[in-house]
Amino acid sequence: MEENTKKKYVIDASFVLSHLMPDESSEEATRFFLKYKTKKIEFITTTLLLYELVNSFSSNIKRNRISPSEANRLLDLYQDYRIVEYSVNLKEVLKLSLKYNISCYDSSYIWLSKEKKAKFLTFDSQLKSITL
């Protein structure tokens, strides 16, 4: 019963990276992750998130912002959170992408947020304006 009463949040890559990346640290993200870790809230995301994180780590390695071993450590840290991932309705994602003139990647998070009636946590200002 307790699981169903937890406030649910959809998280995207910008939100996760602001928590994981040493030079992008955000107090807001850290507070939310602490609440998640102590089981006060629930995080959910799309199956796409992990690919976005790995792509960001790869880009950051190429720019010498992090080392490959640091990327592996951050990936392990994220996976240790065991955040539930959902597949999305691709036709609805396409519709939202066209409606808001955003990528299908971004619209997948918006779709999940609407579908699961969960607040969307992002640091992408364009996406914040759509979901408010």
Predicted regions and their residues:
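Active-site-proximal, substrate-binding regions of enzyme catalytic domains
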Residues: V54-Y81, L90
